[in-house]
Amino acid sequence: MSGEASTSRRKRQRVPSSVESVENGGGDAVARSGTLFELDLLDCPICCHALTSPIFQCDNGHIACSSCCTKLRNKCPSCALPIGNFRSRIMERVVEAVMVTCPNVKHGCTEKFSYGKELIHEKDCRFALCYCPAPNCNYSGVYKDLYSHFYVNHYDTWNQIGCGNFAGAWLRISEKILVLQYGQGPLIAVQCFKETQGMYVTVNCIAPCAPGVGELSFELSYKMPMGGNSTMMFKSEEMNRIQKVSFQTPEKDFMLVPYYFLGDFSTLKMEICIRKLKKDEEEADEDEESEEEEDDDDDDDDDDEEEDADEEE
């Protein structure tokens, strides 16, 4: 359905078509020339989302996507004739024949898709831009470049933590954000928000929602200061992944620290433990290569042992 492909209008590109000559049955040359056209011609004229199969038309040839046909109760808004019973096969073929690149092609993505389907991929593209969480920094880049950028340009606020062990995460309430780096990989944004009930604390990984990228879990603990015995714990089986930090109050996935837990302290002295859900694709490929090399070494050792045995005989 077209509603699944897009939620907003996009900047369109012009698609070129080749120019060639063919001959008809009588041997005469018939010129067939292609022209440039705007991709928004392949959008539903009603909702302006990308057309995807099934596409319907009325008897007068007006087209609409399936979701619009349902919303309009199968009545064409242009001529009031019934629409939604007959599919526009030729329009479906045109839409499927137009191939477009991923919007992140300039950042390294080489994927191509039928028109409209690239938006579905864009949400999970590992080349989607991520934004630097440092205040007053406008840098954006692919997630791996962002990590090196933060280390080089914001080293004074750089904090590295390891895997599977609790480490200190001391967040100054006035600064609202603490950035941690998980090993040599993802940046973790720990944020606090002052609300009526207390302090909201969130933990997010700055990474695209691509398979094998920034897939982490975490545990967060806060102990009542000044000798208190109370400890708060917050655990998430899967850390949220974001491309850009937001300073709007979260509606879910936060730890609430009541003000009476804070005392007069201006710093949230927490501890955090981060674990990886599964290996990144690149690390998995490296492991496979190392396993293959080990297998080759084992085979060579077996061959050497067989040769030694033959010599002894």
From Swiss-Prot:
Query: Which biological pathway?
Result: Protein modification; protein ubiquitination
A Gene Ontology MF term for this entry? Answer: zinc ion binding
Q: Extract the ranges annotated as region (Disordered).
A: 1-26, 278-313
Zn finger regions (SIAH-type) covering which residues? 97-155
Which parts of this chain are annotated as the region SBD?
Answer: 94-277
Matching entries from InterPro entries are given as: Sina-like_RING (IPR049548), SINL_plant (IPR044286), Znf_RING (IPR001841), Znf_RING/FYVE/PHD (IPR013083), Znf_SIAH (IPR013010)
Give me the stretches of Acidic residues compositional bias.
282-313
* Binding locations of Zn(2+) 2: C132, C137, H149, H154
- Documented EC number(s): 2.3.2.27
Q: Which reaction does it catalyse?
A: S-ubiquitinyl-[E2 ubiquitin-conjugating enzyme]-L-cysteine + [acceptor protein]-L-lysine = [E2 ubiquitin-conjugating enzyme]-L-cysteine + N(6)-ubiquitinyl-[acceptor protein]-L-lysine
Q: Which UniProt keywords apply?
A: Metal-binding, Transferase, Ubl conjugation pathway, Zinc, Zinc-finger
Give start-end positions of each zinc finger (RING-type): 44-80
Cited PROSITE patterns: ZF_RING_2, ZF_SIAH
What is any Pfam family matched here? Sina_ZnF
A GO biological process of this protein is: protein ubiquitination
Listed binding positions for Zn(2+) 1 are C102, C109, H121, C125
The family line of this record is: Belongs to the SINA (Seven in absentia) family.
List the PANTHER family hit by this protein, alphabetically. E3 UBIQUITIN-PROTEIN LIGASE SINA-LIKE 1-RELATED (PTHR46632:SF11), E3 UBIQUITIN-PROTEIN LIGASE SINA-LIKE 4 (PTHR46632)
> What does the comment on domains in this protein's record state?
The RING-type zinc finger domain is essential for ubiquitin ligase activity. The SBD domain (substrate-binding domain) mediates the homodimerization and the interaction with substrate proteins. It is related to the TRAF family.
Q: What does this protein do?
A: E3 ubiquitin-protein ligase that mediates ubiquitination and subsequent proteasomal degradation of target proteins. E3 ubiquitin ligases accept ubiquitin from an E2 ubiquitin-conjugating enzyme in the form of a thioester and then directly transfers the ubiquitin to targeted substrates. It probably triggers the ubiquitin-mediated degradation of different substrates.
This chain belongs to which protein, by name? Answer: E3 ubiquitin-protein ligase SINA-like 2
- Source organism per UniProt: Arabidopsis thaliana
